[in-house]
């Protein structure tokens, strides 16, 4: 839904907003993340941990770099405070894809808030947010050949947070500051072009990827 999309300066601001507001406004006192997240997430959760406003736990990884879903459930089951789970959809270095539906269902089962850094996959991977139990996702235009300096934060319509950036009523009072109009238009056009070729591009990228994996 358009009302769930808010424009930001990029993925870093979007993830900072989601994580900080989940702690500040949604009562999350425990953050579960992984040791291989983007710095936009790891540095944000470390900052909140240092401020002593949220405890941070790191889910185990399997030998192939995938998140250990069983360990994630153990952490969720053992938590005695409201939890924020922050796990990236696609790793920007090793390319692993998180089973975002499985993680979302676990979060739903244990009443946790779920944020996924989807900067690497918006524009490259199909999303059905109506049927994906996630509270926050992020995107950045330059990841699909759009302009730098513009991104989005998706906030599920059932989530109520206060602004992270103050000083104006832009973005429906959610994010202060004059909008980057040219960046937003460029974001929309680049996303339109990326989604129009998504299946073709996925097939093209997948062919050399799996060839390399087989040969190695």
Predicted ranges, named:
Residues 1-216:
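Pyridoxal 5′-phosphate
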């Amino acid at each position: 839904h358009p009302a769930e999309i808010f424009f930001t300066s990029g993925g870093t601001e979007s993830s900072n907003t989601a994580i900080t507001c989940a702690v500040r406004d949604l009562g999350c006192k425990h953050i579960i993340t992984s040791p291989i997240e983007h710095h936009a997430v790891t540095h944000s959760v470390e900052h909140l941990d240092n401020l002593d406003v949220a405890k941070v736990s790191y889910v185990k990884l399997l030998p192939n770099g995938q998140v250990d879903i069983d360990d994630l459930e153990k952490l969720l089951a053992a938590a005695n405070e409201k939890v924020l789970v922050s796990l990236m959809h696609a790793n920007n270095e090793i390319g692993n894809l998180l089973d975002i539906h499985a993680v979302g269902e676990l979060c739903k089962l244990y009443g946790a808030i779920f944020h996924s850094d989807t900067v690497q996959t918006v524009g490259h991977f199909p999303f059905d947010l109506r049927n994906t139990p996630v509270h926050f996702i992020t995107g950045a235009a330059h990841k699909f050949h759009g302009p730098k300096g513009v991104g989005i934060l998706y906030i599920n319509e059932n989530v109520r947070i206060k602004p992270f950036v103050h000083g104006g009523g832009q973005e429906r009072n959610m994010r202060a500051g004059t909008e980057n109009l040219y960046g937003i238009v460029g974001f929309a056009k680049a996303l339109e072009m990326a989604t129009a070729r998504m299946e073709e591009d996925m097939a093209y990228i997948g062919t050399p990827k799996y060839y390399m994996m087989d040969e190695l």
